Amino acid sequence: MLVGYARVSTEEQSLNRQIDMLVDYGVDKRNIYQEKISGMKPNREQLDKMIDELQEGDTVIITDLTRISRSTKDLLNIIDRIKAKGASIKSIKDTWLDTSSDNPYNSFLLTVMSGLSQLERDLISQRTKEGLKSAKARGRNGGRPSKRNDKADTVGLLYREGYKIVDIVKQTGLSRATVYRVLNDLKLK
């Protein structure tokens, strides 16, 4: 029996494209396990349920490698669990991922390709960390600029001139809590 597995990383993303591909490949829609969770999460309920319910001779169909795993170690572990049930796994896009035969080239390619996939993620992560470190060295912090920084001088000036908090809130458009935080930061309150 063909069994499908479809996964997206967030609730906002749609599984429709993957489900359509799996159905077109010949997987019965009732046999598609669907998940909206990061591939990096170790506990994926639907993946575990699918593997538990596999029967000898079943074939798990995925649209591509990244749908079932984001790390080499995890991928190889999942494949071992599927094989232990007497089942196999095939990828529609990554055609080299096919454990239904004992082809040594498929095993070799699986190991190499999953390793390259892990290398790519590690390089992206490294570049991101380097970029954040570089930005921090230039005095930039991540995220949206704070509203307090834009109007802190105005809040301090108005407070020193004797304006009440209510009036400062009206003039600056900041919340009371933000005005108090700014005054605290400026050591005026």
UniProtKB/Swiss-Prot annotation:
One of the protein's GO biological processes: DNA integration
SUPFAM superfamilies in alphabetical order: Homeodomain-like, Resolvase-like
Molecular-function GO terms, alphabetical: DNA binding; DNA strand exchange activity
Organism domain of life: Bacteria
This protein's record includes keyword Ion transport: no
Region of interest called Disordered, as start-end residue ranges on this chain: 130-151
InterPro entries from the UniProt entry: Homeodomain-like_sf, Recombinase_CS, Resolv_N, Resolvase-like_N_sf, Resolvase_HTH_dom, SSR_resolvase
Pfam name, any one: HTH_7
UniProt lineage: Bacteria, Bacillati, Bacillota, Clostridia, Eubacteriales
DNA-binding region: 165-184
Active-site residues, Swiss-Prot/TrEMBL: 9 (o-(5'-phospho-dna)-serine intermediate)
Keywords: DNA integration, DNA recombination, DNA-binding, Plasmid
This protein's name: Resolvase
CDD domains, A to Z: SR_ResInv
Organism: Clostridium perfringens
PANTHER family on file: DNA-INVERTASE FROM LAMBDOID PROPHAGE, SERINE RECOMBINASE PINE-RELATED
Functional summary from the UniProt entry: A likely role for the res protein would be to stabilize pIP404 by reducing the number of plasmid multimers resulting from homologous recombination.
Coiled coil: none
Family indicated by similarity: Belongs to the site-specific recombinase resolvase family.
Gene name of the record: res
Annotated ranges, domain Resolvase/invertase-type recombinase catalytic: 1-139
